[in-house]
């Protein structure tokens, strides 16, 4: 049983299938647009940073800088409190 099988648990290597696709570079939208402060009244912008289930999408996924991510969280929470946005997708 000699060979380069890799041992008992060595299985077939699976192809990830990402060869043809390229990863789009994340960038901070607020920095690009030179926004000074994220406004809670701008609901259309805030909705882009909320998942379908109503959760705030983390900065590691959206590419938002930490400074603006904190402002974004506060703005979304304010908009929810003032009933400009729903807390969940069920409302």
UniProtKB/Swiss-Prot annotation:
Gene Ontology cellular-component terms listed: cytosolic small ribosomal subunit
GO BP term (any one): translation
Entry keyword RNA-binding: yes
Keyword RNA-binding assigned: yes
Alphabetical keyword list: Ribonucleoprotein, Ribosomal protein, RNA-binding, rRNA-binding
InterPro entries: Ribosomal_bS18 (IPR001648), Ribosomal_bS18_sf (IPR036870)
Gene Ontology MF: a single term: structural constituent of ribosome
Name of a matching Pfam family: Ribosomal_S18
Function (record text): Binds as a heterodimer with protein bS6 to the central domain of the 16S rRNA, where it helps stabilize the platform of the 30S subunit.
Family that this chain belongs to: Belongs to the bacterial ribosomal protein bS18 family.
Alphabetical list of PANTHER family matching this protein: 30S RIBOSOMAL PROTEIN S18, SMALL RIBOSOMAL SUBUNIT PROTEIN BS18M
Summary of subunit composition and partner proteins: Part of the 30S ribosomal subunit. Forms a tight heterodimer with protein bS6.
Designated name of the protein: Small ribosomal subunit protein bS18
Lineage: Bacteria, Pseudomonadati, Pseudomonadota, Betaproteobacteria, Nitrosomonadales
